[in-house]
């Protein structure tokens, strides 16, 4: 698969970077809100269920607007790819339970650390159809700088 990671490579790449930045901003907000709802309800599981219900409704609305040609592709899609939803459930359930005890910042620090490690592995091997971006010394150095930066923000 062709490498398309240069954010200066046109309007689409910059738009993608901005969208992902906004998604990243939303993760700790979602974590804090779901965690707080879990405390108010005395049930992190109920808070997670409400988060999933809202997410399902929004996804369903987007699906109704989207091109429907994907339906005929469902039977040929590798079945293991549908397990991705389990990772979402694990994240939302774990952040709802752990964050009130561990702190949003600490929880997100370890989420980011896990994301950096798994993203590097997925990119290096091109897992799940991802574009291959081999792990070089420079990339490892960049990841370590990011890890150190996240650690600094948590310990400042």
How should these model regions be labeled?
Residues 2-22, 36-40, 56-81, 125, ...:
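Membrane-interface interhelical linkers
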Residues 25, 29, 57, 86, ...:
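Hydrophobic/aromatic residues within the transmembrane alpha-helices of Major Facilitator Superfamily
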Residues 25-29, 33, 62, 79-105, ...:
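Hydrophobic alpha-helical transmembrane segments of multi-pass membrane transport proteins
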Residues 39-43, 94-110, 129:
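Structural motif at transmembrane-helix junctions in multi-pass transporters
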Residues 50, 110-111, 138-141:
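Hydrophobic core positions of alpha-helical segments in small-molecule transporters
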């Amino acid at each position: 698969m062709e490498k398309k990671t240069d954010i200066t490579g046109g309007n689409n790449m910059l738009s993608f970077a901005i969208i992902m930045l906004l998604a990243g901003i939303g993760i700790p907000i979602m974590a804090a809100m779901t965690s707080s709802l879990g405390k108010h309800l005395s049930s992190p599981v109920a808070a997670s269920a409400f988060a999933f219900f809202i997410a399902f409704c929004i996804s369903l609305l987007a699906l109704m607007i989207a091109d429907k040609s994907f339906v005929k592709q469902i039977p040929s899609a590798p079945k293991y790819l549908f397990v991705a939803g389990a990772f979402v459930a694990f994240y939302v359930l774990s952040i709802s339970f752990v964050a009130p005890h561990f702190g949003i910042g600490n929880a997100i620090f370890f989420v980011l650390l896990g994301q950096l490690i798994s993203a590097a592995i997925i990119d290096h091997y091109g897992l799940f159809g991802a574009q291959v971006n081999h792990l070089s010394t420079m990339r490892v150095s960049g990841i370590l700088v990011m890890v150190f930066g996240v650690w600094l923000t948590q310990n400042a």
